[in-house]
Amino acid sequence: MAATGECEHLVQYYETDQMGVVHHSNYIRWFEEVRTVLFEEIGLGYKGMEEGGIISPVVAVSAKYKTMAKYCDTVVIRAEIVKYTGVRFDVRYKVFDKATGEVRCEGTSEHCFISPEGKIISLKRSYPEIHSRLDQLVNGDREA
């Protein structure tokens, strides 16, 4: 099993701008939407992790807009955790049109793990079971 997730999204009218295309800020929201799905699919849902004292804020995000999505388009949003160190992780995203396969946007986000008090957490030290799960999914036999 890889650390990947996917979801579909029907573009809503309120997500478009005056030109009738999806406003660029919505892609970042869609990244969060699929990232939440990804963590649920690998058994590490955000809600449960936060209840257990692990928060994973975004520390950087980028998006490259390729083509325009419009109202009523269905897009597929894919995410993959591409790097995990025990303290940080990086996610890569691709948004494409469901009907045509045309890529609409590609992006990345970087995250760390913190306590509810805002202190950096090493999952390897503080949550070894969660660390093992993520390490195996992302790094396989390589040690984080």
Predicted feature residues:
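A broad, structural micro-motif
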Residues: 22, 56-58, 104
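HotDog/MaoC-like acyl-thioester-processing domains
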Residues: 3-7, 70-71, 82-144
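Catalytic strand-loop segment that frames the active site of acyl-thioester-processing enzymes
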Residues: 1-38
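Hydrophobic beta-strand-centered segment that forms part of the acyl-chain substrate-binding groove
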Residues: 38-89
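Residue-level recognition of specific faces of alpha-helices
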Residues: 27-30, 57, 92
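Short, electropositive, low-hydrophobicity segments enriched in small/polar residues
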Residues: 24, 47, 122
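Hydrophobic residues in beta-strands and at strand termini
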Residues: 9-13, 65, 113
